A protein has these predicted regions:
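Short, flexible micro-motifs
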Residues: 5, 59-60, 80
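Arg/Lys-rich, low-complexity, intrinsically disordered N-terminal tails that contact nucleic acids
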Residues: 1-10, 85-103
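Short Cys/His-centered divalent metal-binding micro-motifs
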Residues: 34, 65-91
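Histidine-centered nuclease catalytic patch
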Residues: 33-67
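Bulky hydrophobic/aromatic packing residues
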Residues: 26-27, 37, 100-103
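Short Fe-S-cluster ligation motifs
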Residues: 56-71, 95-103
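Short, charged surface segments at domain edges that flank catalytic/cofactor-binding sites
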Residues: 1-34
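Generic alpha-helical hydrophobic packing signal
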Residues: 21-22, 27-30, 45, 66-72
């Protein structure tokens, strides 16, 4: 029997991760997490492995696990990414092109 299906251990890990620093911030996009959303919602909270299980990561090692949005986790897939990999670039949302060459 694999460790991946042990939902009680994963839920306990989710509670521990919530208590750590940045427990309310998505590890990949650095945006706030909403724990009240239903499980299938794109912005619901999931546990993601920094080194995916498919690449040898341990799904029950708290150092390898982080809280993320469901959509960020689906986008990541089976890749190893660093913290904030999907964070918007500084000033990207507020800066508007000043000339047509920048469009």
């Amino acid at each position: 029997m694999g460790t991946r299906g042990n939902s009680r251990r994963r839920e306990a890990m989710k509670r521990r991760l919530m208590m750590l620093d940045d427990g309310d911030i998505c590890w990949l996009c650095l945006r706030p997490l909403d724990f009240s959303l239903p499980a299938k919602h794109p912005l619901s909270v999931e546990i993601d492995e920094e080194v995916p299980v498919g690449l040898g990561g341990d799904p029950l090692d708290i150092e390898n696990c982080h809280l993320v949005h469901r959509a960020c986790n689906l986008r990541k897939g089976c890749k190893v990414l660093h913290r904030g990999a999907y964070a918007p670039a500084a000033g990207a949302a507020t800066r508007r092109p000043s000339t047509s060459r920048e469009w």
